[in-house]
Amino acid sequence: TDTLLYDFKKRYDLVVGNPPFSKLKAKDAKKYLENNINKNTTNTFEFFLEKALAISDYVSMIMPKAILNTPEFSDTREILSHKKIDCIQDYGENGFKGVLVETICMFIDTVGIPNETKVESLTLKQSVIQKQKYITDMKYPYWIIYRDKFFDNISQRLEFDKFTVFRDRQITNSNTTQEKKADCLRVIKSRNISDDGKEIVDIPGYDSYIKKETVEALSAYKYVGNQNVYLTPNMTYKPRVMRNTKNVVVNGSVAVLIPKEDIHLTEKQMEYFSSDEYRKFYQIARNYQTRSLNVDATSVFFYGVLKECCNG
């Protein structure tokens, strides 16, 4: 019997689960999505979670940490925010030995009224009692489970949601070369952006180039020479931002930040992204994740521009 499709005739006191985390093909997911609230996922764990919430008064379930922040699970977060979440245990990458997936366990009272949530981190070795509405605050694009006064103070100094993001998926080792030629553009990779974001660093054996005629057919080409966009390394807790420069193109290890409005960052505003203060803030904003650190459509929200009044 397929548990996900089975029509349970009675309600249960408790469901405990460690469901499979696997993405199904659209045609295989179709039968499960019919009765699912979240129509934007094909991940089996989410189907099991929704099923458990529907048939039980209490649910304790292991799930990927990505549920906290990825766009795919925004509808799931909306469902959960109305349940009473007693505890979120964050295992980081230590949940399953040898499995490079970050996991959490959520303890959910499906009939209770949201109040306080205990957030426990096995990797940070810390435990804190949070107001559930504080960590699931709708003014942010996803849950911030380690939110604190420091985070709130920095938030007051920043203007959020100023950029959209582009990340290349076409420039690879197969269409680039380490040989610099006249008909080539420099490919900027994450390590080429200095720690303070002020210069492009040459790294022998790492630097690469791509033929102009090759890159002209790629999506990233539209940003070549556009000095109104900004570059930031992807997958790092050492963010830094630099203005795009001429005759370069970026690969997927660097995200292109595209201003939503006609804004031009000052030197101080760009410098702030590589400050210790902002980097500490950014770790909290990313829930101390170690795997899913892409600068994506939701996390780019937190590339906040320092307010001019705070530039001193």
Language-model-detected regions and their locations in the chain:
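Signature of N6-adenine DNA methyltransferases within the class I
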Residues: 1-162
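Polybasic, glycine- and aromatic-enriched phosphate-binding surface used to engage nucleic acids
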Residues: 149-312
